[in-house]
UniProtKB/Swiss-Prot annotation:
GO terms for molecular function: crossover junction DNA endonuclease activity; DNA binding; magnesium ion binding. SUPFAM superfamilies: Ribonuclease H-like (SSF53098). Mg(2+) 2 binds at E67. Homodimer which binds Holliday junction (HJ) DNA. The HJ becomes 2-fold symmetrical on binding to RuvC with unstacked arms; it has a different conformation from HJ DNA in complex with RuvA. In the full resolvosome a probable DNA-RuvA(4)-RuvB(12)-RuvC(2) complex forms which resolves the HJ. Its cofactor is Mg(2+). It catalyses: Endonucleolytic cleavage at a junction such as a reciprocal single-stranded crossover between two homologous DNA duplexes (Holliday junction). This is Crossover junction endodeoxyribonuclease RuvC. The lineage of its organism: Bacteria, Pseudomonadati, Pseudomonadota, Alphaproteobacteria, Rickettsiales. Keywords: Cytoplasm, DNA damage, DNA recombination, DNA repair, DNA-binding, Endonuclease, Hydrolase, Magnesium, Metal-binding, Nuclease. Binds 2 Mg(2+) ion per subunit.
Length: 157
């Protein structure tokens, strides 16, 4: 079972792949898809889509775990995040992956035991929970690993 964790964003999208073999978790890969705010939005979304598609084709995940969005006080920011999620969900649908959505507090509680944990705490815990993640320093990638971990430990496969 391979889960693709996705921390959706328009500027810095984090992704990570974690596999589960019997009861053992294995980190496979992670990365950040960066787009520039000065580029046109349709080009940014196309870049996210094509880059994430390469990840899906290379690793063949079974499931995509994506963070649910919350409504930001800045409606433009929320709308742009919605665009990114739409592009991601379209790709997930195109490759017929099972999709799971998790609230940020659920992910934090699953990984750290505390639903309001800081990014540093998530980063610290994933390094202790999943072998091979000790070189991750980026919070976007750490969040994506945490999403994949949450999927693997809370769902029955």
């Amino acid at each position: 079972m391979i889960v693709l964790g996705i921390d959706p964003a328009l500027g810095n999208l984090g992704w990570a792949l974690v596999a589960k073999e019997y009861t053992k978790l294995k980190y496979l890969a992670s990365g950040t898809i960066k787009t520039h705010s000065k580029d046109e939005i349709h080009n940014r979304l196309a870049f996210i889509n094509s880059t994430l598609e390469k990840v899906i084709l290379k690793y063949q995940p079974n499931i995509a775990a994506i963070e649910e969005t919350f409504i930001n006080t800045n409606s433009v920011t929320s709308l742009k995040l919605g665009y990114a999620r739409g592009a991601i969900m379209s790709l997930i649908g195109r490759y017929n992956l099972n999709m799971q959505e998790f609230k940020p507090n659920t992910v934090k509680k699953t990984v750290t035991g505390y639903g309001h944990a800081k990014k540093e705490q998530i980063l610290y815990m994933i390094k202790h929970l999943i072998p091979g993640t000790d070189l991750i320093t980026n919070s976007d990638e750490a969040d994506a690993v945490a999403l994949a971990y949450t999927s693997l430990v809370t769902k029955k496969y």
